[in-house]
Amino acid sequence: MTQPIGLDGLPEKASSSGTTYLDGQLLIAMPVMQDERFARSVIYVCAHSPDGAMGIIVNRPAGSIDFPQLLRQLDIVADGVPIQLPDDGETVKILRGGPVETSRGFVLHSSDYAIEDATLPIDNGICLTATLDILKAIAQGTGPRRAVLALGYAGWAPGQLESEIQHNGWLHCPADPDIVFGRDMDDKYQRALQKIGIDLGMLSNSAGHA
């Protein structure tokens, strides 16, 4: 994230058609998931089209750095200058958004903030912005009310996500902003399952859709 960040090269949101795409849905990893990078993960799907899919893991904290430290590392805020954080929570959570392009930053945020030609509205009042301007706005107290910053993203080639769902890799359901922006990372997986009426203790490897 040492350079300005953008959405270049990511799948576009699909236009309306007879095909069902999962923009704005949560993917919930099934126990059969073999890839440890995605085990028990909850992923917010930002874009899904015939060209592939892109999403952000929302229950994996980065851990090694907090948001104020990052702002100072990027010289967005000088040492000693106060930072005005969003109303919802004491700080913006930094997530490990996925294994692709982990040096890039992506901000999922509420729809009360947008940058023309840089903010992607997704669904249910959730947007994606990937420029340093939003970090500056958050630091100055003029950014979105709710936000999380993800380093990296999860990406799928054309047809790959559909195949993984068909082979019982993922459940999916409409996103809940309280899960996406929630501060307690440990309970997001169970909360997402509860949203579709599934008890974690009884979850089988059979396929299912919400």
UniProtKB/Swiss-Prot annotation:
It holds the Pfam family DUF179. InterPro entries: AlgH-like. One of its GO terms (cellular component) is cytosol. It comes from the Bacteria. Belongs to the UPF0301 (AlgH) family. NCBIfam families: PRK00228.1-4 (NF001268). This is UPF0301 protein OCAR_7326/OCA5_c07920. It comes from Afipia carboxidovorans (strain ATCC 49405 / DSM 1227 / KCTC 32145 / OM5) (Oligotropha carboxidovorans).
